Amino acid sequence: MGLAELRDRFPVLDTCLVQVQALLDPRRVLLAPEDQALHLAWRTQDRLEMATIDLPPDLCRSGQPLNHQVLGETIADLLLEKGFSLPQVDIELLLPLSSCEWRLLEGAAATALSCGDDLRVLQPELGWSLSLQDCYLDILTLQQSDSALVVGTERQLLQAWVDTLQEADLPLRRAEWLLSAAWRGLFDVHAGADQRLVWLVEQQGRWRLLLLRNGFPE
């Protein structure tokens, strides 16, 4: 009995085959949302592909989803339009520029940080609007450096994106701030360079200027 005949007799096999295919060949897709648009990026065999869809004003505001179901369906529809099988997709979320804050920490205490709880114990004065106890923290440390970057975002905002992707039955592989992801790439390109760099970042028609010394923002 051939596979086609088995699938005709036992339709549940289609679901099983899709699940097996998702495990054997997951597709990594970057999702970079803005208030006005969604951006997707993924790699094929020979190049990087991208897709963008405009959003109505009532779906996302200040980086936070307002309608989980509709926004989730919009993401799923765009993936299907680009030929993806949803069970195969692993989403890597790049949080919008306006949704996070970061600070540079220096010294022995900074290099000893391994997670957000370590920072909460120290209770440093970071001078940002987030509460250390109520936000999600990511610590970015680098080898052969006495500095670390701490990135924070509201737990409510991150959970809203988790809920949105769940509405579309899409697994969230990881989440990272768009700016820190871009910074890591820039740091790798200029690794070991003892110089200062001026980094211009466009944000909703406005420019953000960052000064980098030895790879770290001043």
Set out the residue ranges of the language-model regions.
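Small-residue (GG/TT-enriched) beta-loop-alpha framework at ligand/catalytic clefts
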Residues: 2-7, 11-53, 85-87, 128-218
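N-terminal phosphate-binding loop and adjacent alpha-helix
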Residues: 50-82
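Internal amphipathic helical hairpin motif
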Residues: 57, 68-69, 83-84, 95-149
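Amphipathic alpha-helical segments that form well-ordered structural scaffolds
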Residues: 74, 118-125, 160, 164
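N-terminal glycine/serine-rich phosphate-binding loop of ATP-dependent small-molecule kinases
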Residues: 81-91
